[in-house]
């Protein structure tokens, strides 16, 4: 950061006039100068003016480096002229001439390196392993005064690009130190620390010995400025020892990019390589000791014999003792001892029968079995046909229809419709004698009480009439006497006799015997009924013995295996043959000549374009600054666009918020107005109805008349 004097400037023409190619007649003068300079030996060559200018420009203050607008315009026009000359001459140069120019440029590079070794480097050379840098050549800058005003104008040369010092750090690891030097430095630092600690201890001893009552003032040391030490500077691995030979080396730039930088600490030591064996089969795990083989049967037996650890009592004394200091003695042979089991004293009754007992039981069963022969049926000897009884012919099943409830309901409806009305026949009844004696059927007229007139007291309090409670007459219950019972047969209750149930002995032997006899009789009847008829079979004819044909089995016939791989191979072969046929067909079709329409006549003629390449583009080792775009400018544009988008989004958001706020205010205003209208009480006018006009009835009063049922009242 301290190298603020190294500045970076680059002036490139913004407008290039291509018409100057044809106007310039001295375009090839630069190549003539280069060819003349090749004849001068390298020892007698003076320093180039560009190197002198570089030295002068490096010493100039940074404030004076910035050129004026006129100088920049002159320099741009000058660069345009030089570029036009190089571009025109590049077309006429041969290969030999180009090689000479390359050699010349390499020599100029070496001269610049030697001339500028005293000053701090500016740019890393492309393809070289050294870390030397060059100061930029500032165009249009006037030379220093001590060279004189009459000095000739320096010729325009190619500008060498250099990175700005802002993007670089100081070359801290210019020289790598060996391990011995590093150890010595560490020892010196430790010695210094020891000396400082001794001084502090002596000072504290003096203070302690001198008066302890007075307070000692702490001495605060002055802060010392310490330079910044970045960790990234230590990571930079640069080759401090430059290789021997100052020759210019051509290196492929693409391959160097991927190549890791050589570390300065690693120094290759001479000597033969010591071969070491490869431990390929060695595992990471520790070697496990091989245990004795135990079969699964033995493991199972041991598991069942072994008492689980949870049943063992743990003694605290043994746990506290720890491992025994005495060495374990060799194990001796075990003396077998009887376990003194208690199972011999236990005797349980055996429930299982022995083989002898089972055999004796079987013999008894055989002796008890008696063979009972059946009686001979006489009908067999008679030779009559003993036919089985014909089974009784059963009546054929009669189909019975389903009695569905819906059919019953339909039939009932039909029956109701079919019911005819009964013929009404008039039968006269005798006339009751009460009609002739008195009026019958008409109730007597009740006499109403006389109405007492009263004033209609509308304004009085007691105008509301209290309904008179009618006294209900209590109905006198009619007592009806019950009928007298019939005392013809007197009731005599029967006394319950006390009986004692006596248990009598009983047995089912007689009943079982009777049932057994009935069963035997029934079986005899069945046997007599179903006597089989004897039918003798014919004797076989031994004249001709007809044996069945011997079935001769066919031997197994071998068939080839039908493998899936053969099928796949066959399908693949067919596909391949089909593909070959199609390819041959396409080739034959392509061989057949078919003339295409002539479209070249109607197209525009080909016009070769001029090459806009410069001489330096064709040279492999040349370095020309191409147009570039700084990342800061790109980020600034992106940031500007992002801020613009943010501002638009904020504006939209504010508009939406304003609209919602206005809408909310309008809704609140409407609600308040509506509430006001609802809360204000408005008196309604008294309604006026038509007066009630009571009209007198026009119907005359009913005149009561007695019903004249009989003819005696008639005139």
Swiss-Prot record:
Keyword annotations: Cell cycle, Cell division, Cytoplasm, Cytoskeleton, Microtubule, Mitosis, Nucleus, Phosphoprotein
Cellular location(s): Nucleus; Cytoplasm, Cytoskeleton, Spindle; Cytoplasm, Cytoskeleton, Spindle pole
Modified residues (Phosphoserine): 204
Compositional bias segments (type: Basic and acidic residues): 104-115
The UniProt record lists the keyword Phosphoprotein: yes
Biased composition (Basic residues): 85-103
Bias kind Polar residues: ranges: 47-56, 141-152
Single Gene Ontology BP annotation: regulation of mitotic spindle organization
Designated name of the protein: Targeting protein for Xklp2-B
Species of the source: Xenopus laevis
Gene: tpx2-b
């Amino acid at each position: 950061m301290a190298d603020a004097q190294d500045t970076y400037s680059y002036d490139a023409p913004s407008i290039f006039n291509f018409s100057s190619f044809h106007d310039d007649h001295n375009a090839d003068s630069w190549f003539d100068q280069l060819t003349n300079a090749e004849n001068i030996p390298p020892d007698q060559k003076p320093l180039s003016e560009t190197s002198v200018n570089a030295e002068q420009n490096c010493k100039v203050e940074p404030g004076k480096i910035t050129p004026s607008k006129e100088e920049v315009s002159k320099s741009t026009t000058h660069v345009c002229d030089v570029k036009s000359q190089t571009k025109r001459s590049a077309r006429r140069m041969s290969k030999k001439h180009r090689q000479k120019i390359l050699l010349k440029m390499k020599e100029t590079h070496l001269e610049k390196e030697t001339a500028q070794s005293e000053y701090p480097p500016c740019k890393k050379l492309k393809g070289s392993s050294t870390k030397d840098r060059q100061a930029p050549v500032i165009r249009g800058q006037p030379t220093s005064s001590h060279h004189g005003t009459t000095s000739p104008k320096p010729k325009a040369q190619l500008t060498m690009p250099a990175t700005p010092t802002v993007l670089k750090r100081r070359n801290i690891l210019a020289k790598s130190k060996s391990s011995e030097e590093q150890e010595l430095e560490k020892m010196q630092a430790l010695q210094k620390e020891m000396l400082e600690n001794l001084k502090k201890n002596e000072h504290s001893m003096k203070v302690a010995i001198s008066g302890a009552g007075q307070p000692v003032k702490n001495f605060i040391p002055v802060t010392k400025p310490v330079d910044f030490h970045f960790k990234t500077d230590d990571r930079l691995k640069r080759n401090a020892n430059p290789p021997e030979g100052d020759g210019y080396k051509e290196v492929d730039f693409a391959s160097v990019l991927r190549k890791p930088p050589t570390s300065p600490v690693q120094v290759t030591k001479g000597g033969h390589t010591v071969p070491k064996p490869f431990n390929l089969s060695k595992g990471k795990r520790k070697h496990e000791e091989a245990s004795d083989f135990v079969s699964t049967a033995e493991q199972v037996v041991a598991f069942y014999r072994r008492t689980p650890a949870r049943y063992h009592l743990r003694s605290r004394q043994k746990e506290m003792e720890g491992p025994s200091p005495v060495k374990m003695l060799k194990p001796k042979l075990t003396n077998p001892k009887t376990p003194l089991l208690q199972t011999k004293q236990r005797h349980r009754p055996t429930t299982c029968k022995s083989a002898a007992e089972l055999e004796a039981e079987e013999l008894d069963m055989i002796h008890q079995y008696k063979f009972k022969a059946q009686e001979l049926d006489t009908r067999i000897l008679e030779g009559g046909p003993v036919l089985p009884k014909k089974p009784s012919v059963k009546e054929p099943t009669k189909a019975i229809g389903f009695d569905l409830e819906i059919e019953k309901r339909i039939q009932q409806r039909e029956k109701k419709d079919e019911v005819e009305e009964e013929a009404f026949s008039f039968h006269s009844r005798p006339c009751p004698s009460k009609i002739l004696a008195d009026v019958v059927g008409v109730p007597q007229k009740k006499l109403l009480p006389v109405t007492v007139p009263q004033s209609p007291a509308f304004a009085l309090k007691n105008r509301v009439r209290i309904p008179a409670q009618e006294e209900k007459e209590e109905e006198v219950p009619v007592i009806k006497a019950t009928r007298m019972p019939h005392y013809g047969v007197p009731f005599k209750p029967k006394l319950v006799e006390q009986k004692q149930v006596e248990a009598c002995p009983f047995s089912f032997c007689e009943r079982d015997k009777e049932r057994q006899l009935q069963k035997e009789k029934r079986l005899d009847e069945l046997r007599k009924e179903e006597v089989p008829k004897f039918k003798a079979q014919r004797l076989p004819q031994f004249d001709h013995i007809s044996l069945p044909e011997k079935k001769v089995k066919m031997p197994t016939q071998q068939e080839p295996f039908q493998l899936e791989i053969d099928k796949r191979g066959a399908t693949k072969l067919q596909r391949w043959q089909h593909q070959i046929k199609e390819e041959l067909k396409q080739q034959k079709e392509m061989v057949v000549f078919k003339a295409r329409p002539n479209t070249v006549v109607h197209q525009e003629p080909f016009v070769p374009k001029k090459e806009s390449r410069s001489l330096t583009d064709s040279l492999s080792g040349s370095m020309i600054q191409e147009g570039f775009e700084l990342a800061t400018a790109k980020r600034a544009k992106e940031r500007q666009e992002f801020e613009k988008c943010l501002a638009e989004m904020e504006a939209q958001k504010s508009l939406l918020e304003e609209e919602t706020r206005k809408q909310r205010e309008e809704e609140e205003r409407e609600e308040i107005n509506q509430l006001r209208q609802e809360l204000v009480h408005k008196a309604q006018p008294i309604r006026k109805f038509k007066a009630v006009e009571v009209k007198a009835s026009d119907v005359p009063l009913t005149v009561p008349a007695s019903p004249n049922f009989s003819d005696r009242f008639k005139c």
